Regions:
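Helix-rich interaction surfaces within compact, conserved domain-sized segments
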Residues: 81-151
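N-terminal secretory signal peptides
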Residues: 27-69
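Cleavable N-terminal signal peptides of Sec/SRP-targeted secreted and luminal proteins
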Residues: 3-21
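Membrane-insertive, amphipathic helical modules of secreted toxins and fusogens
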Residues: 73-81
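A broad, low-specificity signal for short, low-complexity segments enriched in glycine/proline
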Residues: 14-15, 22-28, 82-85
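Plant P/S/T-rich low-complexity glycomodules
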Residues: 20-33, 145-151
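Short, surface-exposed beta-strand-loop junctions and turns on beta-sheet-rich folds
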Residues: 69-73, 129-130
């Protein structure tokens, strides 16, 4: 069960990374970063509410900005989003993810990739991988602000 929760946290982290584009919100055909996630076959719920800005480059590299760092609790795990996240997004794959981590026991572990396989999302961290049903991420969670995490 702990692995299931870790995967959920990893998925949320991956979503956040997927949100960026070379296109800024004002010039993007997508009005929100959440719509952009759906273009790449990811549910909007892998990214928390409150994204302030995003950018996506032609090569799939992206950046996402929140008002500040925040944490959510998912299935017994705590997931931390930094104020700025980045990675690379392709259809059904977010890799090179930075700025999202999960607390495993007493240690924070970076989530580095999220993959979609059918109706499952697979979250990858350095020490663990976990899969969750895509339908568990239909809505974006609210994030609890963490002042000590810089934007």
């Amino acid at each position: 069960m702990a692995n299931h929760h870790l995967l959920l946290i990893l998925l949320v982290s991956a979503s956040a990374a997927t949100s960026l584009a070379s296109v800024t919100p004002s010039s993007s055909p997508y009005s929100t970063v959440y719509e952009l996630l759906e273009k790449y076959s990811f549910p909007r719920g892998i990214l928390p509410e409150g994204v302030q800005d995003y950018a996506l480059q032609r090569d799939g590299s992206f950046e996402v900005s929140l008002p500040g760092g925040c944490e959510i609790n998912v299935g017994g795990f705590t997931l931390r989003y930094e104020g700025n996240m980045h990675g690379n997004i392709q259809s059904m794959l977010i890799n090179e993810l930075a700025g999202v981590s999960v607390k495993v026991a007493i240690k924070w572990v970076s989530i580095n990739a999220v993959e979609r396989h059918g109706d499952q999302l697979i979250f990858n961290a350095i020490v663990i991988s976990k899969s969750f049903p895509v339908n568990k991420f239909s809505a974006s969670p609210r994030c609890n602000r963490v002042p000590e995490i810089a934007k």
